[in-house]
Amino acid sequence: MITTPRYIVIEENGINLLNDILLKLNLKNPLVITGKRTKKYISNFDYFYYFDYIDIKRNEPNKEFIENICNFDCIIGVGGGKAIDVGKYIAYKYNKQFISIPTTASNDGIASPIISQQGKSITAESPIAIIADLNIIKKSPKRLLSAGMGDIVSNITAVLDWKLSYKETKEPYSESSAIFSKTIAMELVEFVLSNDKNNLEEYPKKLVKALIGSGITISIAGSTRPASGSEHLFSHSLDIITKKLNLNINGIHGEQCGIGTIISAYLHLIEGNITIGEYENIKLSLEKVGAPTIGEQLGYDKNILIDALANAHKIRNRWTILRNGISKEKAEKILKKTDII
């Protein structure tokens, strides 16, 4: 069954509507999952905090958590990626309603029913309500807000990869989900490009709307396909290499996906699947919001970027423009052609 949010709030001081939404949903005993930095946003509400005891990498939360979870009728995730991921995972695992309250807008996980770990998708609970308080989000680091653009433009190449897979492998494909996903991305690109760099006051609001729409598209499709393709494989490949080599690089998902999108869009351009204008607009929109477009901005040297691209197709069994993989020699040429190295 497709589950989409019943309530979506995107406005200044939106968090003040939390009690009203809980009342409308007949939810009386929420469990709030948040972190040390984001706890302040929910401190005026008399709810129970539970964060440090939960680790989604383990098969089961600890005994204390299990004994307490029955006392709550919903989970509220307040924070960035981790708090919301943990919240919707726990909500799914223990059959609770989930409310998402993002404190930044760096990826579509704020609305999707999926958690991604090193390229693998873990099923989670779709939010029944999303409260995006623009006062809070606008105060989040600019780097995170620019990373959100990278996660949104990736929908463009994700949809191209999905359609390619349908043609070459007969993978099930939803035209409506694909159009919805691409439209969300293109509208944000057009907004960014049509406004002066110093006149993007509405960008956070437009970005949040796009990220929520992207997350909902995943729910409708029942798959991450509309929002995750070869560009995400590249990002996950970077994550794996970083961890393996124990590199001190704080890679942000959306930033890596943005660069991955430039790569994927270039490959689709070569095959005639997009125009040169569409390719250039992806890169220009990223630059305009301050997102990285070259490898050095991420902190990776060229050899790591080459390895990540050459091994990206191995991350998961998903047919993309990378197909069965590309050689390191070809990967280097692509990265040079796109000015990433």
From Swiss-Prot:
Pathway: Membrane lipid metabolism; glycerophospholipid metabolism. Its cofactor is Zn(2+). It is found in: Cytoplasm. Pfam families: Fe-ADH_2. Zn(2+) binds at D151, H232, H253. It catalyses: sn-glycerol 1-phosphate + NAD(+) = dihydroxyacetone phosphate + NADH + H(+); sn-glycerol 1-phosphate + NADP(+) = dihydroxyacetone phosphate + NADPH + H(+). Keywords: Cytoplasm, Lipid biosynthesis, Lipid metabolism, Metal-binding, NAD, NADP, Oxidoreductase, Phospholipid biosynthesis, Phospholipid metabolism, Zinc. The keyword Ribosomal protein does not apply. GO terms for molecular function: glycerol-1-phosphate dehydrogenase (NAD+) activity; glycerol-1-phosphate dehydrogenase (NADP+) activity; metal ion binding. Its EC number is 1.1.1.261. One of its GO terms (biological process) is glycerophospholipid metabolic process. Gene3D superfamilies: 3.40.50.1970, Dehydroquinate synthase-like - alpha domain (1.20.1090.10). NAD(+) binds at G81, K82, A83, I84, D85, T103, T104, A105, S106, S112. Catalyzes the NAD(P)H-dependent reduction of dihydroxyacetonephosphate (DHAP or glycerone phosphate) to glycerol 1-phosphate (G1P). The G1P thus generated is used as the glycerophosphate backbone of phospholipids in the cellular membranes of Archaea. Belongs to the glycerol-1-phosphate dehydrogenase family. This is Glycerol-1-phosphate dehydrogenase [NAD(P)+]. It comes from Methanococcus aeolicus (strain ATCC BAA-1280 / DSM 17508 / OCM 812 / Nankai-3).
